[in-house]
UniProtKB/Swiss-Prot annotation:
GO cellular component: cytoplasm; mitochondrial matrix; mitochondrion; ribonucleoprotein complex
One BP annotation, GO: mitochondrial mRNA processing
Leftover remarks: Present with 861 molecules/cell in log phase SD medium.
Organism: Saccharomyces cerevisiae (strain ATCC 204508 / S288c) (Baker's yeast)
Superkingdom assignment: Eukaryota
Gene: MNE1
Record-given protein name: Protein MNE1
InterPro entries: MNE1
Amino acid sequence: MKLLFKRYSSSHIGKLIKDSLITPEILPQLGRQPSSHKRLPNNKRTNSITDKWLKDALTRKDKLNEDKLQNVNLRLNVVLTTLQKLRTSDNPALYFALLNRIGTGHIKWLNKSGRQIDAFPPDRLPLEFYHELSNMLYKLSLRSANDKIALAKFSLQLLDRYYFLKTKSLTIEGKFRANIKFLRNCTLLIVKSQSNYYLRAIQRLFAENSEGQLLANLSQLAFYVETSQWTSMLDILSSCVPDSGLRGSKERERAIQLLELFSPCLVKSLKVMIAQNMENEACQILRSLSEWNFHFDQHDSSNLIQLSQNHSCLKVIETMNGLSSTTAVTRQFGLEKLPTDVSLKQSIHILSKDNFEPLKQDSFLQFLSFKLSDLPLNLEVWKKHIKEVDDQMQAESNLHSLRAFFIDMLLCHLSVRKDFDFMLSLVEHIVYEKNLWQPLLLTDNIVGNKENSTFHCLFHGASQDISTKLTLLALYNQLNEIGYQFTSHDFLSMLKVCKNYSDSDFFYFAFYNLLVTQSHKFFLFDKFSDKFSWRLPIQIGDAISEWLSSLEIDIQENTDRVLQITDDVGEWYVENKPFKSEKGTIQPINIMELRKIFGERKTLFHMDSEIFQKSKAKRDKEMRNEALFTANDAEYNFAADVSYAKRVENLFSYIRSKQMQQK
């Protein structure tokens, strides 16, 4: 099983590389260890896994020495393929162990046809290994680890050494061009450090080696995107898509490749422009990219089109349709011809007139929620606005489904833009005063909205406030009683509010219920390795990592416990492969088996308000015994949490009573 959250011990990325990758050819500043130094713990064993891989790469006449590689012929493509598989299977320890082994020997490298590769100084690794290593370092940088500065330093040293070997290579001077994917990887490693100092350093290396202004501009764009400097990003964007007629054929081809490699930054820039209603500017960038024969992949294209529909940027959709062989469906139930300043009430009027049915028709009308942004942070103003829109809907259609659509749009907007108290107050107004509890329940049936309906919005809104642990517990218990279909995002919201050791029992309660209901969705088939694997989603792994890193006591104990749980659950799925034969669906792990994995005496499998308060008091006492106090303790408001939780319980009690009255 591949873990997506880091282990808080001595296995940080920077230390892993320093311990394993002590190869002067790659990192000359670390120096070569004495010959008596045993680099690998298993290098005395002739049957170690690295020995096996190297034997696969040997020519028939060579033999592998158990301690060192001396004067052997290895096939480059076989070793590279092994490294690529280790990278893809997320095994950095063995990856660097193998790279270290080949870097400390005297090897003659052979190409696929068996001829020696001699276009680089003797006893130096071929440049292909630099390209491959940059891919691995970039993959490591995607983790939520505290090693991004270390990776940035490594990438600078790697690039500097790469250019040095380039000048010393036997390739004819002037014809050698650096691998642009390697340059992109090094750039993004630097960018992820968010250090302007390292950015300037890599740009100087590019300038000294005549890599061209476009690469420097794209690296600057990537830096602005990573650091969310949107104004600066917009200023430099046009220079990243220059006049396509100014280049020769080779330079043009290289520029197109660079643009494609940096396409995530370009896509993010376009998304910012669309969100800011910079429609004309976005269209100009799209037209400039088309002159370079640049094409977005289907995923990015779909996301840009949907975002444009959400923000009613119809010119962008038309431009993308003109540049693409496929055409997006842009009809918005009569809204496509409306000016952007049309009010929400006018939009609802058109939807009602066109008999829009959100429970049957899929739509891209989320952009209407942006028309709520102008309302001030005043509860009475919002209540008045809700009344006006609802009165209009009652007069024109009185359809519960259209009112459900309006409520869902309203709460999705509130969950990300207002505090939880404000959001909960409006929900209470909708249920108690407006008597719209039926449309509220219907939001779960809106087409294409299964994972973003009202109650999921409540989970997300509550997770934005640190004083909502008991509130989220109450919300979960109330919905669990009626058999509600939770998503992994609901449990992510519960994990996010865990901020310190006092939250331990609540954390394991949420983690357990996540695995009860969602773990079968994390069991996937890896096409590359041709095997099944089980892994936690990245966001879940990040939330777990954040909680583990915030613990004041028992850090190692909890880290080991979480790792053991995920290991055991993953092993259960991989070993049992619990498929239902009739449909090919995956059977969730047995609850009794999962409880055994968590530990019956260690975990609270049932938790209500009283149990929560007792468990928190117990953990608080353990903290006081250690004389520990954190900023998170001061931020958490228990009284507010109790109040929110009671209001949530009252809401559900009221809705249940209304349902009983109608039976």
